[in-house]
Each structure stands twice: as C-alpha cells, then as structure tokens.
Regions:
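Solvent-exposed, charged/polar functional surfaces in cytosolic regulatory/catalytic domains
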Residues: 9, 75, 203, 207
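C-terminal helical cap(s) of enzyme catalytic domains, especially alpha/beta-barrels
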Residues: 121-135, 177, 189-213
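Alpha/beta enzyme core
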Residues: 12-13, 25-162, 168-186
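Hydrophobic/aromatic residues in well-formed alpha-helices
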Residues: 2-3, 69, 173, 219
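Extended, intrinsically disordered, low-complexity segments
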Residues: 143, 202-226
C-alpha cells in the first residue's frame, strides 16, 4: 500500500522527495523492501530502522549488535542506489561502536535516536499497562539522552548524522546541530501539534538571531570545538 497508495497521495499533496522508513524482521526482509522502494522516484532516501527484533537471531534487535547492524546495512546497500541512513536504537551500552560498524558497512548516514524502552504499571490491576509489558518511550523527556548520543556518534563517524528524539522547538533544533546533527527529524511532537514542523521552521530565523547565529550550517558540531 505504501507504493500503490501512500506515495501517490504524498506526491499529490506535497510533490517533494520523501524519506522512506524501513523495518524488517530478517535481513532478507530489509533487502526486499529496500529493493522495491529503489525504483520509486519519489523516494529520495531510505531510513533503515534496525531496532526491529531479529527473528533468526533469538529475537535480539539488529540495532543492539554491531555485526547484525552491519549485515543489514550491507544487504540494503547491495540492492539500492539511494542514500541509506541507518536509524539506531538508544537501548544499548555502546551506540558509537554500532554507528561505526554501519559506517564501515557502507551507510551513507546515521539517524538517532529511536525510542527508549519504558513501562508503566496499572495500580488497579497491578499489571503492566502495555500488553507487551514494555514499549517505546518518546517525547520531550528523552531529548537530553538523544542530544548526548548525537554528540557521541557525530564525534566518531565521518558520515552525516540526523538527530531526533524529543525535538519540539527551534531551540532544540539548534542544540541538535551544535551537538553534530546535519539534519533534524521531529516525531512525537507531531502527534501533539500537527503543525509543529512548520512552526519550528518559521521560528528558526528568530532563534538564530537571538543566539547570534548567521548560518545554521556553520554551527554543525559547534559544541565539539574547544
């Protein structure tokens, strides 16, 4: 339906290139999906979400193992000419080693972070609120964690880093860029305000002036200097 319905609908509404987010439960499934999307002119980039469980690897997320993440990267790069951005999970002990493994495997960029693992318990039933016990925790509360990981990864790789995780203001975008992000994605905030992206774009010039920034591109990684 993405190819037959969603892409035509998006083209009619925006007529812009889109980034397709790809998930999979096996390396073959990732490769199959990316190969199908490779022929779609409207898809400008592929963002490969390696936070999915590897059904052939004991259920462990591809994104928690440098070797598995690299295998997915290589498989996808073999079937597409489009830029491939690997989206990393924060639920790891060493996100830098995973980012570097993806870079070595041919990734064109790294995006981070996906949701943090969290849970809640219903005090009436004394049971987890989520049927699967744990689930993805997102929103502004995870911004400091995302910022830290963007800072760490951008220091270690030589490919573009896309920052995300709790971004909800022009100031957050500027912080992400100072941490090393060359681009910024917005997720959960769209569910609160569907117009948040437009508002942030419109607010950026004023925020840049406030903090004496002439060109946003000039501040990328600025927090690393000195």
């Amino acid at each position: 339906k993405v190819i037959s319905e969603e892409l035509p609908r998006l083209k009619k509404c925006f007529n812009k290139k889109v980034m397709a987010n790809v998930s999979g439960f096996s390396i073959d499934e990732y490769a199959y999906t990316c190969e199908k999307l490779d022929s779609q002119e409207q898809v400008g980039w592929l963002e490969v979400n390696v936070s999915c469980p590897n059904v052939h690897g004991g259920g462990m997320s591809f994104g928690t193992d440098p070797k598995a993440a690299a295998q997915v990267t290589k498989a996808v790069k073999a079937v597409t000419k489009k830029p491939v951005i690997i989206k990393l999970s924060p639920n790891v002990t060493d996100i830098v080693s995973i980012a570097k493994a993806c870079e070595d495997a041919g990734a064109d960029g790294i995006s981070l972070i996906n949701t943090l693992l969290g849970m809640r318990i219903d005090l009436r039933t004394k049971k987890p609120v989520i049927a699967n016990t744990m689930g993805g925790f997102s929103g502004s509360a995870i911004f400091p964690v995302a910022l830290r990981m963007v800072y760490q990864v951008s220091s270690a790789v030589n490919i573009p880093v896309v920052g995300m995780g709790g971004v909800s203001s022009a100031e957050d975008v500027i912080e992400m860029m100072l941490a090393g992000a060359t681009a910024v994605e917005i997720g959960a905030a769209n569910l609160v305000d569907p117009f948040i992206c437009k508002k942030i774009v419109e607010a950026l010039p004023t925020a840049a002036d406030k903090y004496n920034i002439n060109e946003l591109k000039d501040i990328i990684g600025g927090a690393h200097n000195g």
